[in-house]
Amino acid sequence: ISLEAALGGEGAQAALPDRLEIPGIDVDIPVVELGWHAATTNDGAIFSEWDVAEYAAGWHKNSALPGQPGNIVLSGHNNILGAVFRELDQLRAGDEAILWTGDDRHAYRVDQVLIVPEKNATAEQRAANAQWIEQFDDDRLTLVSCWPRNNNTHRIIVVARPVDSTDTAHAAGQ
């Protein structure tokens, strides 16, 4: 089955994101596809751990594609390997984020900026944190990074909502 057919039937327009712009914090970065790998805790338990992009934002391959329903998840470093999400904590509700798939522009407005504990957090807290990168019934773009810059004890989660369907128009036609 083709990706197009799986995501919405024949004629559906779905493509991998390839660039993210956030004008308010001077971000204009490539987006690459990310997967995950098996990792082991100190006590020998095996778990899945997301890969993280270097010098780019990473699109989580089990998340939605731009123009399709669901949660589009991008992650990136805040203090190493390009520090592409270094300034996420400067975003405020109403700030714009633009996700590109080739020449197609998908505009979003920041709705929430959350900072949640991660290091030494309870299993329940970490499970609650992980819910932000799962699928939702509504359309959203979720950006995730470590926080703060000096010790990464928390996660910063930015949720942005589509501006409207006219802002996902082909850039050449605007």
What are these regions (language model features)?
Residues 1-174:
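Solvent-exposed, non-transmembrane regions of membrane-associated and secreted proteins
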